[in-house]
């Protein structure tokens, strides 16, 4: 006799091992010629183009050499009053 409220334990399936050659092909296909259609990404891209934000990790214009330790470029200081 089994109880009406008793549940059987779920069977756990093991994933097959991932090969290195499978990963090499998959990494290249993740963002291959696909336009990101997220509203957040659109706003972020507009801010980058306006110059009010640094290039993001997802931006295609990012070179990878940008760091927080870079010194600001020499130029007149911006005033908050005008």
Curated annotation (Swiss-Prot):
Modified residues (Phosphoserine): 2
Protein name, UniProt field: Musculoskeletal embryonic nuclear protein 1
Keyword tags: Chondrogenesis, Cytoplasm, Myogenesis, Nucleus, Phosphoprotein, Secreted
Cellular component GO terms held in the UniProt record: cytoplasm; extracellular region; nucleoplasm; nucleus
Tissue distribution of the protein: Expression in skeletal muscle is reduced during limb unloading but increases during the active recovery phase that follows.
Short motif (Nuclear localization signal): ranges: 10-18
Secreted is among the record's keywords: yes
Role description: Required for chondrocyte development and proliferation. Plays a role in myoblast differentiation and fusion. Modulates skeletal muscle extracellular matrix composition. Plays a role in skeletal muscle function. Plays a role in glucose homeostasis.
InterPro entries named in the record: MUSTN1
Family: Belongs to the MUSTN1 family.
Main localization, broad class: nucleus
Protein location: Nucleus; Cytoplasm; Secreted, Extracellular space
Any GO BP annotation: embryonic limb morphogenesis
The keyword Iron-sulfur is annotated on this UniProt entry: no
Region (Disordered): 1-33, 49-82
């Amino acid at each position: 006799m089994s109880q009406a409220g008793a549940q059987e334990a779920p069977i756990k399936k093991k994933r097959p091992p991932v090969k290195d050659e499978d990963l090499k092909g998959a990494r290249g296909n993740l963002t291959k010629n696909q336009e990101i259609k997220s509203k957040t990404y659109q706003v972020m891209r507009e801010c980058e183009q306006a110059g009010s934000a640094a290039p993001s990790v997802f931006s295609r214009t990012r070179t990878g050499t940008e760091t927080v330790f870079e010194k600001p470029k020499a130029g007149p200081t911006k005033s908050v009053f005008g």
